[in-house]
Amino acid sequence: MKVSLPAFEKAKVLVVGDVMLDRYWVGPTGRISPEAPVPVVKINQVEDRPGGAANVALNIATLGGQVQLAGLVGEDDTAKALTLGVQALGVEPQWLKIADKPTITKLRVLSRNQQLIRLDFEESFDKQDSARLLKQSEALLDSVDVVVLSDYAKGAIDKPQDFIALARAKGVKVLVDPKGSDFSRYHGASLITPNMSEFEAVVGAVTSEADLLEKARGLLNKHQFDAILVTRSEKGMTLVTANAPELHIPTVAREVYDVTGAGDTVISALATSLAAGAELPQACAIANTAAGVVVGKLGTSTVSRIELIEALALHHGESGFGVVSEDQLAYALEQAKLRGERVVMTNGCFDILHAGHVSYLKQAKALGDRLIVAVNDDASVKRLKGEGRPVNQVDRRMAVLAGLAAVDWVVPFSEDTPQRIIARLLPDLLVKGGDYKIEDIAGGAEVIAAGGQVQVLGFEDGISTTAIIQNIMAKQ
């Protein structure tokens, strides 16, 4: 997906929540234990990674953001290992140390890239510990633009309503990765990011898309949230806000190896993007892409800016793009505009695709973020070009166009001109190749009336479908 990244280095974020150490024991399995019907793992690798709220902070730091981290830890060696882990990426933690509690540890045993078992070492922190942590964190609010509350229901985030209210009063956005069935604890938050299971634990089973939207808007009104982003695994994400249409973002993950930390990645990318000045739809698209990267890795992982740029480029051609119907395109276009993308549209027969076409389409795409190509169907090509045309049927012409890197959507139309479909879609920019006058371009008046632009691009001299056909026939 083509989404421009904001200046992450300008982002100032505070992460408060349940920190933990993710510990991995890794090795091969070659036999079954004689003591019980379980595999024997010969450990040859041990690795510690910051997890929970600490993983959120590391994700923000890896993207280039400035981050402060506050959490509860014990006075133990695990806390020391966790401190070293976050300091390695330049994060200086603000721990509140609790003498009689252990630092939370999740130990995973893996073999052949598969998790065999997880062992948890933890005790929930007391309510007064959470109150002290949140009070300590209030002093950091004046130095940040966004706060993330990373709640794993381990006791760090007990009753954060006063903290949320204070942050909002200071103009600081508050993002919450929620836990449990009581979202009233996060009353007044800017955005919450439940996964589908967490969402249904609060609102009940979701029976349809309309039901999801209705229940999400009910939560918005009840708890005074600005927005809810429901993460939906293979169905992507759905953003619901009070005063705008919903935004559905399809998943971008190609292979899923491990979902550990995917929720952390979503909220960290959201927080970094918003703190850097991105609008919410753009931030959601960035977060969705980041999540698609991290689930392709093993264990708790972070996503770098370079990985994110590469993933955004690779996302072209994913679900929702390519050859589409007019209705599908109308919906996709609505979603693109909600993400703040500039949409360019052109049209033509494209009977035999040649170098001139490719050059022209690259020029058109360079003028925006998305390119629509409307293609004359076979009957309209025959009316325009005469007997013997088209050489290639419309489905083949569209398939070739959809394979070009410059093209996002290809849609057929049956009229002699694309005026009707252009008037329906109303792109930000309508382009046409050749020596047309702007006032003569079909659909141009409608685009201009809607606040868009019309532009004429030049074709490469000496290259045309007609000339290619004549050259082929001359050689027969």
Curated annotation (Swiss-Prot):
One GO term (biological process): ADP-L-glycero-beta-D-manno-heptose biosynthetic process
Pathway note: Nucleotide-sugar biosynthesis; ADP-L-glycero-beta-D-manno-heptose biosynthesis; ADP-L-glycero-beta-D-manno-heptose from D-glycero-beta-D-manno-heptose 7-phosphate: step 1/4; Nucleotide-sugar biosynthesis; ADP-L-glycero-beta-D-manno-heptose biosynthesis; ADP-L-glycero-beta-D-manno-heptose from D-glycero-beta-D-manno-heptose 7-phosphate: step 3/4
NCBIfam families: cyt_tran_rel, PRK11316.1, rfaE_dom_I, rfaE_dom_II
Stretches the record annotates as Ribokinase: 1-319
InterPro entries: Bifunc_HldE, Carboh/pur_kinase_PfkB_CS, Cyt_trans-like, PfkB_dom, RfaE_dom_I, RfaE_dom_II, Ribokinase-like, Rossmann-like_a/b/a_fold
Source organism (scientific name): Shewanella sp. (strain MR-4)
Protein name, as recorded: Bifunctional protein HldE
Amino-acid positions noted as binding ATP in the UniProt annotation, renumbered to this chain: N195, M196, S197, E198
Gene Ontology MF term list: ATP binding; heptose 7-phosphate kinase activity; heptose-1-phosphate adenylyltransferase activity; phosphotransferase activity, alcohol group as acceptor
